[in-house]
Each structure stands twice: as structure tokens, then as C-alpha cells.
Amino acid sequence: MDSMTLFIASLAVSCIGALASVLLIKADNAAKTAGCLIGAVAAVLSFVAGIQAVLGDVTSVDTIVFFPFAHFQLLLNQLSGLFVALISVLAFAGSIYGLNYFDEYPGKKGRAGFFFNTFVASMMLVITADNVFWFLVAFELMSLTSYFLVVIEENENSIHGGWLYFVIAHVGFVLIMASFLTMTNFAGGSFAFADFRATQFSPAVASVCFVLAFFGFGAKAGIIPLHGWLPKAHPEAPSNVSALMSGGMIKIGIFGILKVGLDLLSASGVQVWWGLMVMVFGAISSVLGVAFALQEHDIKRLLAYHSVENIGIILLGVGASMAAMALNSVGIAVLALMAALYHTFNHAMFKGELFLGAGALLYSTGTRNMEKMGGLFRRMPATAIYFLVGALAISAIPPFNGFVSEWFTYQSLFNAAMQGDKAVMIVAVFAAVALAITGALAVTCFVKAYGVSFASAPRSEAAANAKEVPAPMVFAQGLLAAICVVLGIGAPVIAPVLVDVAASVLHPYGGVFAAEGMELMNQYSGAATSTPAIAIALVVLVGLACGYRKLKTVGKVQKSQPWACGYAPNEHMPVVATTFASEVSWFMQPLYTLRDRCTAVCWSIAHFFQKLTGVAEAVEPVPDKVLVDAPHKGVEKLADLATKLEGGNYSIYICYIVAALVVFLVLAVQMG
């Protein structure tokens, strides 16, 4: 069975899952079970279709459905196949996870199953649509279904986060539509992407289309300064939906940037400054994303900011590829794009695992606040181990997958800097430095997140009474954690496949073959493709260290309470998230402003000092204040003014109508 047949079958199964959830909506548990299990089957089918496409089974479909002017055109090539496979893995894990996690939404399980399945199906359609009309329809459906999942709790925070996401998503939609309609205008009015690929747009038109698309898809990806919805919406969505949004949906922003810049505008040729712009925004997003994450105590907000960081890292590879392609350095272009695609898949896996882990903590403790956790390793050992794998992967620690893709990104930036173009050299070096800073801060952040959540003693009754989550939730976490290990250790096999995918994207620029990228990859892969040896060495070293410690301490270790300056140890004494990041907070304090304050949250050993202390409980990044909160307050003031103008008096409304008619008549006379 070819890849397209399997893919269409998966869409049909997703629709069946959504329909089953609606038909069984009054039987809450049955609706949940049907939606999740059928969704898992659809994910398996689409995963197989995606892998077949990645390996070369490129297929398409072109038929008339509803509208003669807009053929229903789908294209499943190597690039779209990779993204289909990525989303399928997350959809499968999220479906299995939802068998228990959706129990947190009594009376809404059928609704959750319906929107979950339609959300997955709409993302699949966006990736494969080969026509402007159907692409935009699927894109809008994706935004709407994810919005309804964000607001499913129907409380103040979820509605606020969902509304902000809804607004930014539609700002991006307008920019994307403007880009596509501009291309349609210069491609003879055609809506088919195939005609865009065959049209040679002028440099000015191509640049306008790319910039519009970059910021439009950037709003969906969460690049700074269009990131404000991520820390508001991700924490409010169900955790398996957060995993799918952060791991999958925001990657559609990356897919869109690649599709427009390197596919639809391929006949026009990429320009150097496109790549420089992408790298600059990538560097800013990566550094600020992790800096903002460091200040968070809410574990899901922390992970949302890390999505901004990793989108920035992906954009570094995309930008380096574009700049190298414009300079005719095809080998570097392939290597850089391969690094970006590798990190795209890697981030989906480890961020998906981390969000599922955060959901497990919320499920067991009832809180997202890390300050109220602690001591969870002993109470939730499976979740703790799988979360540790995700934390090591996102921190780029070998032999996990994050290390491999970041290594290739470094090599791409270093090689791009040596191509003789001064502007490219400056930006590439700047990007490499930003990546190094990002890596150091990411390690610090996840030492904090893991240590404060899982180590030490419980800091609340809920943490002390926490238990391991049900088996389906553990399985979903374990699956993604295992994939993180495989993607790291399997780099020698996986990287060449991704080189082939990258070469297929860049091929329209003329004579770009996978062999050139493969040669450069083999030359500079170094430690990245040595991860199996690194893994074996680490296992041996850890085993030797544990054995040595065991032999040295037999019969010599006595357990006792830690000394606390004469006071009895209690749950308020361990280092908490606030103090752990205090040094970095001081260094980066111009980036933050207080969100709210509370007194006596930083406990001292002595009651006297405890009374005197008062620290910030949470901070808000300055860009979020300026770009999100200020416009929001402005709209609220306009709404208040409009309310005052209404007054409820019909005579006033008639006066408004008469005044409007007079204004329009005057304008008509003057124009006329």
C-alpha cells in the first residue's frame, strides 16, 4: 500500500474517532476511550505513511472537492513525510496518555476526544496540502480546534490564555494569507502550489512574500516577539495536548517557513539576507526563551518558554542553510538544513516527554508550582526517570538526541562563517555564541527544575502523598523517552536519512545532491555520530563508579538527619526554585518585571528572619509586558469607553446613526 493511501486512511480513522467521541458524548468514559483508542490507530497509520514518504515513496492526489477553482491537492513528499511521522508519534503517545489523563475533565471527555482527533487531522492536512485554499482552510481548522482544547477548563486563566492564542494565531493567519495571495496574483491567479514553484518572482516580490510568511508562520512557531501566547496557552491545555502543541503544532510554523522560502519560491532563488534575518531572530529567541524559563516556578510555563528557545535553535540551522544556499555552498546548506530537521524531530520527542511528565506531576500533586513539590523521585520513580531522560536530552547531554542535533548546528554555523561573506560571518559567529549561552542556561534551568521537583523532601502535603500515575500515562512517557535515546545513539543511521530529506528540499536550486551534504557531514560529524561509543563509555564508567562506591562504603555508612545549625530539619529548608536561579536572575534583571509578590515564601531557619523576608514569587518578562499586556489593556480601555458611549438609551443610538450618515454623505459629496 502506497504512502498516500495509508495517509488518507489515517485521516478517515481520525474522523471516525472524532465522530465516535461526539456520538458517545453522554457516556463520558466510553467517549474518552473510543476517541483515544481510535486516535492511536490513526496515528499508527499516518506514522507508517510518513516513514514511507521519508524513504522515497513520494505520492500526491489531485481531485475536485466542492470548489472547481480550488482542487483538493495533497502532496506527501520527503519533507512533509518527516513532519507527518513527527506528529504521529506525539498523537499516539497523547492518545494513550489521554486514556487516564482526560479523567481530569469530567463531563468534557467526549469534547476532548472530538477536538483532539480533529486537531491531529487538521495538522496532517496543513502539512500535505498543495493548494492555497485547502492549506488555509486546514490551518484555520488547526487553530480553532487547538483553541477549544486550550479553553476546555473554562476558567479565567484558560479563557485568557486561549483568547491571546486565538488573536495571535489569526494575526499570523492574515500574514500567511497575504503572502499566498501575493504569490497567486503573480502566478496568473492560480491557487496551486505547483504553479508557484514554476513561477520566477522578482526579487522584491519574493522578499515581500517571504517576510510576510516568516512572521505569519513565526507567530505559530512562537518566535520572539510573537511568543506571548505560549506561556499563557500551553499551561492551560490538557498536558497531552500541550505536548502535541509544543512538540507538533509549533513545528508547522517551521514547516511553513521552509515551504515558502525553499520550496514555493524556489524558482526565484533564496537571498542572503533572508538567512541572516532568520538567524538573528533564532539567536534572540533561543537566548531570551531560556532566560525567561529560568525564572519560572510553574513547570508548564517553564517548558513553554523552552519551546521558544528550541524554535530559535531550529531557526539557526534554517537561516544558515538559506545563507549558504545563496552563497552557492550547497554542502553547508544541506548540513545546516539537516541539523534543523534533526533538532525539529528531537525537540518534538523530548518536549513531548517533558510535557507528559509535567502532566503526571500535576495529576499526582494537583499543582504546577515546583515550589510545592519535592521528594517525588521516591514516590513517582518511573516518571522521575523518564523526566530525567527528557531533561538530559533538552540540555544537549550526550548520548541523548539533543546533543546530536545541536552539534550539527554548531558545525553548520562554523562552516557558514568561513564562506567569505562578512555579513554571514558576523551573524553566524553571533549565532554560535548565542547557542553556547543557551546551552549553559538550559543545563542550569533543568538542574533547577529536576532537583526542585524530584529531589530533597516534599514541600507540601500533596507532594508527600503523591503516587505514580496509571500505566498508560507511564507507557506514553517511556515511549518518548526511549525515542530520545534511539535518536541519539542511532545518529549514524538517522543522520544520512535526514541529509537525503534536506537535499530533496534544496534540490530545486540546482544540482544539490545528498552526496555533497553527506561528505561534509562525515567530515564534521565527529562526536555527533559517535554517540553509540559515548553511550557505552558512560554506562561502563557509571557502573565502575557505582561498584567502587559500593565496595568502599560496605558497613561504613550510617544514615542520619542533615545538620541544620542546631534546628530540626523541616520541609522549608531545602533550596527552592526562587533561590536556585537567584544569581542568574540578578544578572538578567533588566529582562524581568514582577508579576506578583508575596511575603514569607522564602523560608529561613530562624522565625525572626522568616518574618523579615519577602521575595518575588513570580516575574514577567519585559517583552511580554510590552507586547502582550500593554495592547491587551489598551483594548480593554477602548471597550470600557465603548460601553460608556452605549448608555442603553435608544435616542443616543439614533443620534449615532444620523451622525454616521452625515459623515458618509459629506465624504461622498467631496469624492464626487
Give residue ranges: language-model regions.
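Membrane-interfacial helical/loop segments at transmembrane boundaries in membrane proteins
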Residues: 59-68, 192-198, 408-420, 494-524
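Hydrophobic alpha-helical transmembrane segments
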Residues: 74-88, 203-217, 423-439, 515-542
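Hydrophobic core of alpha-helical transmembrane segments in multi-pass integral membrane proteins
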Residues: 15-19, 39-50, 91-92, 180, ...
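Interfacial loop-to-helix junctions that mark the boundaries of transmembrane helices
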Residues: 1-5, 73-80, 131-133, 196-203, ...
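Aromatic-capped, Gly/Pro-kinked transmembrane alpha-helices
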Residues: 493-536, 547-672
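Transmembrane helix-loop-helix hairpins at membrane boundaries of multipass inner-membrane proteins
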Residues: 1-9, 16-114, 186-200, 500, ...
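Hydrophobic transmembrane alpha-helices and their helix-loop junctions in integral membrane proteins
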Residues: 93-110, 116-135, 145-468
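Hydrophobic alpha-helical membrane-insertion segments
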Residues: 37-50, 170-178, 387-399, 476-499, ...
